[in-house]
């Protein structure tokens, strides 16, 4: 019997993928394969370890990129297009990644009997589920959840789903169109520039540290219970509140397409109970520590 001693992390050179790989190197003896197209991932995120292999490629080509799928224990599919506002101007790229690419990953796992761990988004949950229609990004992600639900019914496909909430922390993107809110604020603070806040500024988010996020990813993988998890923070901040924590000047930007007023925290999605977990790392403490280090 072939020993399954490897996991795949799509988006392994990106923000979440890099932190997940670090955690798995620490907690397991598994070998790790990263698949990343480097649209937002960086070679500077590569971890020098003989247990990690980095492959440049698109998820749609996963069957060609992975020569021996019998070795693969699990796939963490985190390599999707992951920005709401940018999905309007880059809709083809969003659909290519989130629909076509993800379908290839799902089929790869199904065909080879590999467990999938999939990153979902809180952006599609609010307003009684209607927020899924706010942007191409939210729509594509919600359709993937519907597909997974049907794959479970049709083929008994096994997977875990983890809902992310405005993740921040080490390796986050700070510059360019794929930047995170906290990353943008940190970058502008370092450069002495006013922090950009999209109007009205009162839109609230449950900012969740990357360590809390990947710990739940690992927990879900380890427990192997085929559940839907959410990892958020108990405290919700408005964007303007967060900007003010930096004690810096603020400039307002025009309202944007697809903007949600609040992060949704629900008990159920589709037919699945949501197992809710809350992060331990406090955003205010994190920002205070950042300011201390940069003064």
Can you describe what each PLM-predicted range is?
Residues 10, 167-171, 197-207, 229-237, ...:
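Glycine-rich Rossmann NAD(P)(H)-binding loop
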Residues 128, 170-173, 240:
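Short beta-loop-alpha junction of Rossmann-like oxidoreductase domains
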Residues 167, 183-196, 204-229:
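Alpha-helical substrate-binding/gating segment
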């Amino acid at each position: 019997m072939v020993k399954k001693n490897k996991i795949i992390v799509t988006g392994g050179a990106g923000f979440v993928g890099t932190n997940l790989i670090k955690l798995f190197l620490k907690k397991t003896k598994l070998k790790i394969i990263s698949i990343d197209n480097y649209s937002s991932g960086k070679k500077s995120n590569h971890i020098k370890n003989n247990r990690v292999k980095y492959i440049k490629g698109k998820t749609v080509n996963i069957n060609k990129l992975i020569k021996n799928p019998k070795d693969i224990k699990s796939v963490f599919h985190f390599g999707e297009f992951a920005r709401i506002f940018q999905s309007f101007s880059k809709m083809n790229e969003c659909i290519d990644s989130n629909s076509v690419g993800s379908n290839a990953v799902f089929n790869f796992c199904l065909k080879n009997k590999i467990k999938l761990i999939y990153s979902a988004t809180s952006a599609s949950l609010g307003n009684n589920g209607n927020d899924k229609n706010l942007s191409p990004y939210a729509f594509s992600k919600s359709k993937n959840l519907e597909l997974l639900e049907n794959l479970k019914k049709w083929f008994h496909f096994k997977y875990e789903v983890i809902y992310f909430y405005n993740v921040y922390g080490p390796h986050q993107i700070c510059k360019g169109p794929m930047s995170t809110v906290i990353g943008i604020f940190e970058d502008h603070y370092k450069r002495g520039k006013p922090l950009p806040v999209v109007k009205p500024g009162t839109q609230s988010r449950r900012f969740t540290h990357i360590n809390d996020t990947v710990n739940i990813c690992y927990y879900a993988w380890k427990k192997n219970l085929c559940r839907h998890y959410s990892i958020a923070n108990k405290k919700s901040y408005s964007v303007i509140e967060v900007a003010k924590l930096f004690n810096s000047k603020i400039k307002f930007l025009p309202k944007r397409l697809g903007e949600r007023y609040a992060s949704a925290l629900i008990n159920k999605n589709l037919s699945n109970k949501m197992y809710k977990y809350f992060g331990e790392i406090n955003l205010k403490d994190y920002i205070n520590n950042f300011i201390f280090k940069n003064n």
